[in-house]
Amino acid sequence: MKLDHWQKTLDHLRDEEMLRGLKTVSGAQRDHVLLDGKDVLLLCSNNYLGLADHPALIEATCRATRDCGTGTGASRLVSGSMALHEELESKLAQFKGTQRALLFNAGYAANTGILQGLMGADDVIFSDSLNHASIIDGCRLSRAKTVVYPHRDTHALERLMAKEAPLRKGQWLIVTDGVFSMDGDLAPLPELVALKKRYDCLLMVDDAHGTGVLGDSGKGTGEYLGCLTDIDLHMGTLGKALGGFGAFVAGPDVVVQFLINRARSFIFSTSLPPGVVAAGIAALDIVNGSEGRQRRMNLQKLCTLFTGQLTESLPPEVRGETPIVPILTGDPEPTMRASAWLEAQGIFVQGIRPPTVPQGRCRLRATLMATHQVEDLLRAADLIRKVLSA
């Protein structure tokens, strides 16, 4: 077997400071972890509410595993559909205010499955230019015509929709991140709702980074912006603010039935194990209650504090609304140098490079958790300012 081609590509990536590798973290996803045996402040986890080591989730996982075993043995359409799956789906539908919900094994599997399952060659998908990679791949798998509009630019989107209108054959769908994963900014959902009504199409929101975090009840970006019930398809994850693993779509009953029959990532995957599903149920109960509200309030205070310390280093659109803080650094080499220096100082924050972000828009992507301590964040902000000015 010829391996030279792949090795040359890896060598080129290394020369360009673009080679990715794995770092070994020990312990739970707390505010501090052991990174290669060294204590560091964890500033790059999506465990926004700090639920990944919550005693209620751990106990629920252990109880379900003792009762139901470690795995389901098959896909949901064979023998892998359990009462726990249905309980969590019912709670998620109620949480998002929809008729029904359907679990997927990961956010990537959800977006690719939803778009591939619902859309086809006669359909058109309108997709924000900074949507997550799983949405981009889902659009490709669907075989629908994909029209990409400039980031958050609803005026440009309307022009593109008007241009497509005379050619319309099938279903139209607008798809957007709710909270954009690399910039932390919000989709203009009220304006997108107006467009979807004007052009009689569907609106799908990937709220992986908003679910559990935004809104008085943690229902996400739609609740925060006052248009939750106008969203047709809500995609969310259980592996970020909810502290577990898996993903879901919530929407009309007919959509869920259709996806059960057409979404390949659902049909051909062994279902989520009982312990994982039970943790999702426990997490949702916390998010819905007073503890979840208190954690969101604390997280918001920390977001305001941290972004306020780094105002000069952040894009102007960053206002501390979300726990994603993009600290722009430009090119790969200074980005990775800054990340390595901060790691040596006990701050674990990853450098983000293309293709995850556009050329020239490399960054340190800091993410906050409700369990972070003020003094740790102040020290981290001071060190970030120092490395950026070096």
Curated annotation (Swiss-Prot):
Cofactor or coenzyme needed: pyridoxal 5'-phosphate
Assembly: Homodimer.
Gene this chain is encoded by: bioF
Pfam families attached to this UniProt entry: Aminotran_1_2 (PF00155)
E.C. designation(s): 2.3.1.47
Any Gene Ontology biological process: biotin biosynthetic process
Protein name: Putative 8-amino-7-oxononanoate synthase
InterPro entries in the cross-refs: Aminotrans_II_pyridoxalP_BS (IPR001917), Aminotransferase_I/II_large (IPR004839), AON_synthase_class-II (IPR050087), AONS_Archaea/Proteobacteria (IPR004723), PyrdxlP-dep_Trfase (IPR015424), PyrdxlP-dep_Trfase_major (IPR015421), PyrdxlP-dep_Trfase_small (IPR015422)
